Design a protein with these regions (language model features):
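AAA+ P-loop NTPase nucleotide-binding core of proteostasis motors
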Residues: 1-402
């Protein structure tokens, strides 16, 4: 390949530059990057690539001196006026090629939505990709003109965020909001009230844009509805048009040793991979107190800055996630299933004593789940039985469970 490129005076384009340091021998010193160094130095091979500043530092660390053989050109993100002009050029292109036209307000709204929610990519590339997707779907649906509702609809499909949380002209119906959670969460009305407040803050755009949407800690024994609440939040916030529930659950008892941290936040870690694939989702860290303290230290960056960079310099953006941690601290000894009263016990004091202040202080909302009384237990049982009764295998046989 090197000799063919030299003979034809061709240029090799590499999309993933860091892989040069990871491909080849057992270590970076035996990698493809090291092998190609002499060809680059002698002018036999010309390479063009792209990378983030973080990836550039990774390459300098893995293969010292390699990137110094390249001319490094810094490319800044386009400003708003320039990006909007690019949108207009793209609109002219789609109008000319497939007869699809975006209104000016639709183009401007695309910029606003992408600027607020898709900060892990840059303009104009992220906008062109989004507008291209909108145009393709409109073409298949035999639509020729796209306006504000269309752009919101397509963005909602991609992110799972309901349109009324994206549109300034639509208000949240407080009654239907509470009804949604009351149908899914039993016996925890104070929790529902707090969740509704978080949703209203998000709707108003008042949440900190440089942190996760919210960081919550649910305390209480097993069986009081902590996981069910996390599922309900993910369904409401990010569940529109999604095939799979936008939630990842990590059992933190699986991360009790220092070396296991990379299984969570390393380049192949479960959490990092999930957030890259589904940046709009709920992250449920179950029984957080069972994780190794190094996990808490690593999570500080996520809770404080809303971002995490893995060992290969790749960014995982948590600013569109809701992080929910559950804890049984103080509740296990008193009630194994949450059916007995623990009234008067200071769960928050247990949590505060367990975590370092810098970790505890980054939790936005601390919620203690009530024990379940007989009426609530009956309501939950009937709800679960009703869901089972509505399954095809039961309905087709005409069976009744109660």
């Amino acid at each position: 390949m090197v000799y063919d490129l030299e003979r034809t005076k061709g240029v090799l384009w590499l999309e993933n530059f860091v892989m040069l340091a990871l491909t080849g021998g057992e270590g970076p010193e035996d990698s493809l990057a090291s092998f190609l160094t002499s060809f680059i130095r002698q002018g036999q091979l010309r390479i063009v690539s792209e990378m983030s500043l973080e990836q550039l530092e990774v390459m300098r660390r893995l293969v010292p001196g390699f990137v110094e053989h390249f001319q490094i050109i810094s490319v800044s993100e386009m400003d708003t006026p320039t990006s909007l002009r690019i949108f207009e050029y793209f609109n002219q292109y789609t109008n000319r090629t497939i007869n699809i036209n975006f209104s000016q307000k639709a183009l401007e709204l695309s910029y606003v939505l992408l600027d607020r929610f898709v900060r892990y990519e840059s303009f104009p590339g992220k906008a062109i990709r989004f507008l291209q997707t909108c145009a393709n779907q409109a073409f298949l649906a035999n639509r020729r003109h796209l306006d504000v509702p269309d752009v919101i609809g397509y963005f909602s499909q991609q992110t799972g965020i309901p349109d009324f949380l994206l549109r300034d002209d639509l208000l949240i119906d407080n009654e239907s909001l509470h009804r949604f959670f009351l149908a899914r969460i039993k016996g925890q009305n104070h929790v529902i009230d707090k969740i509704c407040s978080i949703i209203k803050v998000f709707k108003a755009g008042l949440n900190d844009p440089n942190k996760p949407v919210a960081t919550l800690l649910f305390a209480g024994p097993t069986g009081v509805g902590k996981t069910a609440t996390a599922k309900a939040i993910s369904e409401y916030f990010f569940g529109i048009g999604q095939k799979y529930q936008p939630l990842i659950r990590l059992d933190m008892s699986e991360f009790q040793h220092p070396g296991q941290i990379y299984r969570m936040i390393g380049s192949q870690g479960k959490l990092v991979q999930h957030v890259r694939e589904k940046p709009f989702s709920v992250i449920l860290l179950d029984e957080i107190e069972k994780a190794h303290p190094l996990i808490f230290d690593a999570l500080l960056t996520v809770l404080d800055e809303g971002m995490l960079i893995d060992d290969l310099g790749r960014l995982a953006d948590f600013r569109n996630t809701i992080i929910i941690m559950t804890s049984n601290l103080g509740g296990t000894q008193r009630s194994s299933l949450g059916f007995k009263s623990y009234q008067g016990h200071d769960f928050e004091a247990d949590i505060r004593a367990f975590f370092k202040p810098e970790f505890y202080n980054r939790i936005d909302v601390f919620l203690i789940f009530n024990p379940l009384d007989e009426i609530t237990i009956r309501a939950i049982t009937l709800k679960e039985l009703n869901e089972v009764e509505n399954r095809d295998g039961i309905k087709q046989r005409g069976l009744k469970l109660f």
